[in-house]
């Protein structure tokens, strides 16, 4: 199947798979809709079961391997290989499928992007690139079309197959391999050779070679590095590529080879021109590198014989100028033009790239002059070429001649060291004549306008673009772009070299800055609108060598054309504090300690021009070229500081490669220009200077050596170039590392929690085990600790940081899962000195961690709780238990502390203080016993669950009283002075812990039984007891706790005589006499009692 050549095959191939799927879905839906219509024609199951693929076709599709769709254009039919490049595909075919290489390999069509095997390509060329002659017509246009196609009319007998080499970048073709290789040297590697080329006796600009008007000046160029003197420019480029850059493989990869079937060229008659037309311009035999473009028609009086060669957006091609401006069809498919035209008639040639060439005709009898063996013309290409310009020597007796005034052709510089435009002054011979000698200077750079395709000198181009096309001039700043030469720039953010055609898109990714207000834009249209609105009256600075210009057409309508002028970073004109200046010079001397306010010191700036980096400190964000982290601050400060601190390198220029690279701050070794961050890490592992400088392995004498040895000056960090906010922020971050002076802090050695010496030779698991031990000592290591551990243990810093992070996460998960208690004990004696009231949270409990004492207390308390309901137990038994408990707890002053069992409750947040003195405990138990006998309150029936819950001696009625008060919403003062005194006593002596309730019924029962007990407590002491408490000292407290039973019995009898104690306590006030006496009593006993408490700690664990 043959079809017309299609462009944009890459885009079509990407969508082809989706289109096929859509079409298959449509076909499937169609089949489903019409399955009923065709059911009558369907054979029965017998035929379906007994039919095989061999009955239908010659092959079984089930045996064919289903190959995935390949989106790359060059696909091997014998294996799954596919490639985007023809050279890789051809190499694969030659190496793997060499048995039938010539017939099966895909070939490129020399006229379009069609690819096919040899036989199919021949048919393709015959059908599409050799059109039949059109029918004769009387009209002039038909006559012109007929004459244009005369040279392309193939005859079957005249077709020949010719092997040609071609340039894959611009489709330049030639049968000779050397010619194509020289073309590539001359046209596509100027940017590589330019830094090496120098001219004798003249200093070049930006590494370019100044071009003279004499052809012999081409031999004056030489290589800067090795002083090689070539015979030609191509020889010098070849020398640079093969000897210095060593990229000769790139040249070989750019040369392709194919066999093309083309019509045989007809012999041409060579006739001398008329005498009045002897002045003509001789063209070289091989001018295929000239780009076709607009050639303006000029009157015949103008004798300036220069050829217009617009380069951008045009194709590399060659045109043979023949008699009557006849472009004869040759072996490479250049179309021809008819011969019969009137004087002054203009013929437009449709060349590649939509660039018509207008050539005026002055005579019908201008004959072609071609010497034998030298005439060669080349086909047109379809690829765009980079904007480059060339000069060519115009020699006599070479190819063809044109009368003067036919073509205006301004000489254009193809490259900075290309061929020189020479003018011959000899008398023209009959066969071919050259123009008269010209004295015009040929060193002027020319640029082509991308809109009108006209050539202009570089100094007037911007004026033309601004006035003729009403272009708007928009200035911008890109300090991160370093202009290497006219075709290549380097991005300091990404540390990569960028060609001109992709430079603008790359700059828009980082953003262009406004030169007036420091705003950053990622869109040219928005930046132009910003300039029109905000800075319409601002004056632009002068254009420098580092300025890049871009001509853009944004949209149709007003302000369509934009002339963008981007000021970039220039290494020569950079100020002293710039990145490259520090890179090429020695590291700065460590600054002297200064006061904190003066840390932002004035940096001395050279008197060199500042135009190259006018706003060096205005870039808001900087991208590290090694780790791609975003840094805030100016380039030269933030980036240099980040490289020194994070990567331990400083920027420099490689002494051999002359490229921007880095050197180690420890051993001052220089890295190669293609290094990465991993290269630095690998070097630091083996660097001998690491342990002697910043990482602080020599902890004892590190500060003294730093002060004495000037060679270690780069180790000390220089903060004088930093902004003050950065200094303040860094100081806050580093406060935990050192409490000393900020400027001396970087020199302080790192003190590790565990010494890693001796573990560097251990296994990986052993070193990880050491890190786990270190984590148990120091779970939050600083950055410098991690760096020192990495250097000592030969581990990556990322591995160490990840290990610590994983351990911390595991600890957090375990805390959430197991809910461990964190004990935060405090001094009860000091706590008692606090005068104001303290409100402990509901989740805090008080525990006694003396296990032996608490175990005894718990067992005895359970016995007492279970015997509460038995009437045969006497009060004396209870008091004996009390004395045994006080003796068993380790001292006469210790109150009873018990651990409450953690039972799930419905209301876990109600605070229940669980610690009271033993005397109050026994009196409350007696009150509870009397309440059970009386009829004031309902009888409380203790179940087994209640018995289990109340096996703590600390479950007192005082606690329950507080719970009832908080639950009912009443203030503590409403319960009367007695309960207030007891609660104050507990607050001053004990900690709290949340109590738990088994259910609501038990809670209400405790509440009902707690009120009368709490209200009877304050009256159990008489006046004698109160006087004892007031005058008691540390030694007298024991007597209070060991009072005889008669005193407690009298107190209980007095309590029984109280009529309706609940009403009395509700009517009483906090300022009663008994309350004051009880306060004084607690003040006397609290200090000695707290001094004897051991093991009382605060737990954050909730029940």
Curated annotation (Swiss-Prot):
GO biological process, one term: negative regulation of synaptic transmission
Comp. bias (Polar residues): 393-423, 692-710, 972-982
Bias kind Pro residues: ranges: 427-438
Keyword line: Acetylation, Chromosome, DNA-binding, Homeobox, Isopeptide bond, Metal-binding, Methylation, Nucleus, Phosphoprotein, Repeat, Transcription, Transcription regulation, Ubl conjugation, Zinc, Zinc-finger
Upper lineage: Eukaryota, Metazoa, Chordata, Craniata, Vertebrata
Position of the Glycyl lysine isopeptide (Lys-Gly) (interchain with G-Cter in SUMO2) cross-link: 39, 72, 144, 155, 203, 231, 266, 274, 278-279, 311, 335, 367, 408, 427, 600, 606, 616, 621, 632, 658, 699, 716, 728, 731, 745, 807, 829, 835, 914, 929, 936, 1017, 1036, 1043
GO cellular component: axon; chromosome; dendrite; extracellular space; neuronal cell body; nucleus; RNA polymerase II transcription regulator complex
Annotated region (Neuroprotective peptide (NAP)), positions in chain: 354-361
Modified residues (Asymmetric dimethylarginine): 348
GO MF terms held by the record: beta-catenin binding; beta-tubulin binding; chromatin binding; copper ion binding; DNA-binding transcription factor activity, RNA polymerase II-specific; peptide binding; RNA polymerase II transcription regulatory region sequence-specific DNA binding; zinc ion binding
CDD domains on file: homeodomain
Described purpose of this protein according to its UniProt entry: May be involved in transcriptional regulation. May mediate some of the neuroprotective peptide VIP-associated effects involving normal growth and cancer proliferation. Positively modulates WNT-beta-catenin/CTNN1B signaling, acting by regulating phosphorylation of, and thereby stabilizing, CTNNB1. May be required for neural induction and neuronal differentiation. May be involved in erythroid differentiation.
Modified residues (N6-acetyllysine): 1036, 1043
Compartment(s): Nucleus; Chromosome
Expression induction or repression: By the neuroprotective peptide VIP.
Phosphoserine sites (modified residues): 98, 409, 413, 608, 709, 738, 805, 876, 878, 886, 889, 905, 954, 956, 1072
Residue ranges the UniProt entry marks as DNA-binding: 754-814
Record region (Disordered): 133-154, 360-439, 691-712, 873-1029, 1045-1103
Name of the protein described by the UniProt record: Activity-dependent neuroprotector homeobox protein
Basic and acidic residues: bias regions: 143-154, 922-954
Superkingdom of this protein's organism: Eukaryota
Subunit relationships: Interacts (via N-terminal region) with beta-catenin/CTNNB1 (via the central armadillo domains); interaction is direct and stabilizes CTNNB1 by modulating its phosphorylation by glycogen synthase kinase-3 beta GSK3B.
ZnF C2H2-type span: 74-97, 107-129, 165-188, 221-244, 447-469, 489-510, 512-535, 622-647, 662-686
């Amino acid at each position: 199947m043959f079809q017309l050549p299609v462009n944009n095959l890459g885009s079509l191939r990407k969508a082809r798979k989706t289109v096929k799927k859509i079409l298959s879905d449509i076909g499937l839906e169609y089949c489903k809709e019409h399955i009923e219509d065709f059911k009558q024609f369907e054979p029965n199951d017998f035929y379906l079961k007994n039919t095989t693929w061999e009955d239908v076709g010659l092959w079984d599709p089930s045996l064919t391997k289903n190959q995935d769709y390949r989106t790359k254009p060059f696909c091997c039919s014998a294996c799954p290989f596919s490639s985007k490049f023809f050279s890789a595909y051809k190499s694969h075919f030659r190496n793997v499928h060499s048995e039938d290489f010539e017939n099966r390999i895909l070939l490129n069509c020399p006229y379009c992007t069609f690819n096919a095997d040899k036989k199919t390509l021949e048919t393709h060329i015959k059908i599409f690139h050799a059109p039949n002659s059109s029918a004769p017509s009387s009209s002039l246009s038909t006559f012109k079309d007929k004459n244009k196609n005369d040279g392309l009319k193939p005859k079957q007998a005249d077709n020949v197959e010719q092997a040609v080499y071609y340039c894959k970048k611009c489709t330049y073709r030639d049968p000779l391999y050397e010619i194509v290789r020289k073309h590539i040297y001359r046209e596509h590697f100027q940017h590589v050779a330019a830094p090496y080329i120098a001219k004798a006796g003249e200093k070049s600009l930006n590494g370019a070679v100044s071009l003279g008007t004499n052809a012999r000046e081409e031999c004056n160029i030489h290589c800067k590095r090795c002083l090689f003197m070539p015979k030609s420019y191509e020889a010098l480029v070849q020398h640079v590529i093969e000897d210095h850059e060593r990229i000769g493989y790139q040249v070989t990869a750019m040369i392709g080879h194919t066999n093309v079937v083309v019509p045989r060229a007809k012999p041409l008659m060579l006739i001398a021109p008329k005498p009045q037309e002897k002045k003509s311009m001789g063209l070289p035999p091989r001018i295929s590198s000239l780009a076709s473009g607009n050639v303006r028609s000029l009157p015949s009086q103008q004798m300036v014989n220069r050829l217009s060669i617009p380069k951008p957006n045009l194709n590399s091609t060659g045109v043979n100028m023949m008699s009557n401006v006849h472009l004869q069809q040759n072996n490479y498919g250049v179309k021809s033009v008819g011969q019969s035209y009137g004087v002054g008639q203009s013929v437009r040639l449709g060349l590649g790239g939509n660039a018509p060439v207008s050539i005026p005709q002055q005579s019908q009898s201008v004959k072609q002059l071609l010497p034998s063996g030298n005439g060669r013309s080349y086909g047109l290409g379809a690829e765009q070429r980079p904007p480059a310009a060339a000069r060519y020597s115009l020699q006599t007796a070479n190819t063809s001649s044109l009368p003067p005034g036919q073509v205006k052709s301004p000489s254009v510089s193809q490259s900075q060291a290309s061929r020189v435009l020479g003018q011959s002054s000899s008398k023209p011979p009959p066969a071919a004549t050259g123009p008269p000698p010209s004295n015009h200077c040929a060193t002027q750079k020319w640029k082509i306008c991308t809109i009108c395709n006209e050539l202009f000198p570089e100094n007037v181009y911007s004026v033309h673009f601004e006035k003729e096309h009403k272009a708007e001039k928009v200035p911008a700043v890109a300090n991160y772009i370093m202009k290497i030469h006219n075709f290549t720039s380097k991005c300091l953010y990404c540390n990569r070299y960028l060609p001109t055609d992709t430079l603008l898109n790359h700059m828009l990714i980082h953003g262009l800055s406004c030169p007036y207000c420091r705003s950053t834009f990622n869109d040219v249209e928005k930046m132009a609108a910003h300039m029109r609105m905000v800075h319409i009256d601002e004056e632009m600075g002068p254009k420098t060598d580092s300025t890049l210009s871009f001509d853009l057409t944004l949209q149709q309508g007003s302000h369509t054309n934009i002339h963008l002028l981007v000021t970039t970073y220039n290494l020569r004109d950079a100020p002293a504090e710039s990145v490259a200046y520090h890179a090429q010079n020695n590291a700065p001397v460590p600054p002297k300690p200064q006061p904190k306010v003066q840390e932002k010191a004035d940096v001395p700036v050279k008197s060199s021009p500042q135009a190259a980096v006018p706003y060096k400190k205005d870039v808001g964000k900087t991208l590290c070229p090694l780790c791609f982290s975003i840094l805030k601050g100016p380039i030269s400060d933030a980036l240099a500081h980040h490289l020194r601190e994070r990567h331990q390198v400083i920027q420099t220029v490689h002494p051999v490669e002359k490229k921007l690279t880095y050197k180690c701050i420890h051993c001052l070794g220089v890295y190669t220009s293609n290094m990465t961050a991993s290269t630095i890490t690998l070097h630091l592992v083996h660097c001998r200077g690491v342990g002697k400088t910043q990482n602080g392995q020599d902890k004892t004498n590190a500060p003294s050596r730093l002060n004495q040895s000037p060679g270690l000056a780069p180790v000390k960090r220089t903060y004088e170039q930093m902004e003050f906010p950065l200094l303040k922020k860094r100081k806050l971050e580093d406060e935990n590392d050192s409490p000393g002076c900020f400027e001396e802090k970087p020199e302080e050695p790192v003190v590790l929690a565990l010494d890693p010496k001796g573990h560097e030779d251990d296994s990986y698991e052993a070193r990880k085990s050491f890190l786990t031990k270190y984590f148990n000592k120091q779970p939050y290591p600083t950055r410098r600790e991690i760096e020192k551990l990495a250097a000592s243990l030969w581990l990556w810093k990322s591995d160490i940081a990840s290990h610590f992070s994983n351990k911390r996460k595991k600890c957090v998960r375990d805390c959430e899962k197991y809910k461990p208690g964190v004990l935060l004990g405090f001094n009860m004696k000091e706590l008692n000195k606090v005068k104001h009231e303290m409100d402990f949270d509901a989740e805090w409990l008080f525990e006694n961690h003396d296990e032996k004492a608490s175990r005894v207390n718990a067992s005895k308390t359970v016995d007492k709780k279970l015997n509460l309901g038995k009437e045969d137990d006497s009060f004396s038994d209870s008091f004996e238990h009390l004395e045994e408990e006080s003796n068993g707890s380790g001292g006469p002053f210790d109150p009873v502390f018990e651990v409450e069992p953690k039972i799930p409750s419905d209301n876990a947040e109600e605070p229940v203080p669980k610690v009271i003195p033993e005397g109050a405990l026994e009196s409350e138990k007696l009150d509870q016993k009397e309440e059970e006998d009386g009829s004031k309150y309902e009888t409380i029936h203790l179940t087994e669950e209640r018995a289990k819950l109340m096996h703590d001696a600390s479950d007192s009625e005082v606690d329950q009283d507080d719970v009832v008060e908080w639950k009912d919403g009443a203030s503590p003062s409403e319960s009367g002075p007695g309960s207030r005194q007891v609660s104050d006593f507990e607050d001053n002596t004990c900690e709290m812990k949340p109590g738990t309730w088994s259910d609501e019924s038990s809670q209400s029962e405790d509440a009902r039984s707690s009120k009368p007990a709490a209200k009877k407590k304050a009256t159990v002491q008489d006046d004698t007891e109160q006087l004892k408490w007031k005058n008691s000292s540390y030694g007298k407290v024991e007597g209070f706790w060991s009072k005889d039973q008669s005193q407690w019995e009298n107190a209980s009898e007095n309590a029984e005589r109280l009529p309706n104690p609940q009403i009395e306590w509700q009517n009483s006030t906090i300022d009663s006499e008994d309350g004051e006496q009880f306060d004084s009593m607690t003040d006397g006993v609290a200090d000695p009692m707290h001094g004897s408490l051991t093991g009382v700690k605060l737990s954050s664990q909730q029940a």
